[in-house]
Amino acid sequence: MTLRVTNTLTGEKEPFEPRDPDSVLLYYCGLTTSDPPHLGHARGWVHVDVMARWLDYLGYDVHHVENLTDVNEKIVARVGEDGDSEADVARHYVQQAIDDMRSLNLGRAEVYPRVSEHVPEIIDLVERLIEQGHAYEQNGSVYFDVTSFEDYGKLSNQSVDDIESQGADTEGEKRHPADFALWKAGGVDPADIAEHQHPEAAPAEEACQTAQIWDSPWGEGRPGWHIECSAMSMTHLDESIDIHVGGQDLVFPHHENEVAQSEAATGKQFANYWLHVRLLETEEEKMSSSLGNYFTVADAVEEFGPDVLRTFLLSTAYTSRATYSDETIAEAKERWDRLSRGYERAVEACDDVDAHTKVTDETLRDAVEDARSAFEAALNDDFNTREAMTALLDLTAAVNTHVDGHDEYDYQGLRRAVETFEEFGGGILGLAFGDDDSGDVSLAGDVVDLVLTVRQQEREAGNYERADELRDELEALGVEVQDTDDGPTYRL
């Protein structure tokens, strides 16, 4: 069965056909590192994790990139509360995000690029747009001219005339109200962070003095929001990719503007498939940091554990409405208890019987193969994790029926059931069945980070030969190291 996905660009569920039949380029718009990650972020993380795992299962070489936005006015608003500068606050929440991802048993993306590490690439992309007549400079800021891109609005299904404005234009710098900033002159204005500040934060003027700024052909300034993802996706994947995933709230303006600036610069379709994860809701509204109605990932993992949370988040398809409540989390706990107990009973029954037993239960064996087929059909149907979970629950019921109804067990049938729990429940859904190795991948990433820290210390101490040796040893293990002005990055 061919994988089909719901493509926001076309509004249709359509067959997935990658540019390269052997590989998939997947980009996920990650979070802004200004607050503790919450369950709304976790919903996106876990669904993209399953997408990547399933594409890998289908035989593709998956190149998965997920950005972490570490330059933003909301981050500046937290100065004095979670760090002494914008960069400090960002580092604090970047680390928390990585820790939270690990706690949810996420497979590691190939790279987690930060905006602060890609300013030269951003400037290069802005210059290309100016040279091609798609952008213009005004008083040190650079804006994208939406009227220069004929297909503007194709992702969100609206026209330029439908859009009244994008961002403030107090200086009257824009040619069209819908034009958006690619580069912002100067630093951060205290007025821009006032609504995001907490009482514990530093005074606005003091916080803004810590904001990161960079030199550019147009003077000192900061990147615009939308240009960042285009530059990072092109840097780490290609000018045209297969799948771009993000939250439903990003369709407009963020993803619409990504399409416009990327395709205007390259003349190529930026992403062939746009997949959008519906937001997690609580009491009829989205869960978000700005609304203050969120449950942090760290608190949720501590209270419920990663398997209950993954079960909760995957019990609803990524395109469907999902609601957090005491009732829905209790349902997830009951569902996980059934799944884990079914797996344990299958393992225990296998241990109690001779592998060469002649007992055959065709009902069990048929149920196992039916569950496998149903699971595969579900994931091939737009990564439908709800139906995939149902297939595993049906498998659990079949195992219970067999164990409860027989004095002698069908070893081969039970062994196949155990393999299915581990391969599909563990390897694809990321639940704790058997030996899922994604935790090993996360640990490997932590070890690489540690080695790079030591290598950077050696370089700063002038021990360049030893630093080069560490780099060579990493590359011999398949870790590509790239040195940038903001420190080393790597990809596995």
From Swiss-Prot:
It holds the Pfam family DALR_2. Zn(2+) binds at C29, C229, H254, E258. A motif ('HIGH' region) lies at residues 31-41. Its main location: cytoplasm. Keywords: Aminoacyl-tRNA synthetase, ATP-binding, Cytoplasm, Ligase, Metal-binding, Nucleotide-binding, Protein biosynthesis, Zinc. GO terms for cellular component: cytoplasm. Its cofactor is Zn(2+). A motif ('KMSKS' region) lies at residues 286-290. Belongs to the class-I aminoacyl-tRNA synthetase family. PANTHER family: CYSTEINE--TRNA LIGASE, CYTOPLASMIC, CYSTEINYL-TRNA SYNTHETASE. This is Cysteine--tRNA ligase.
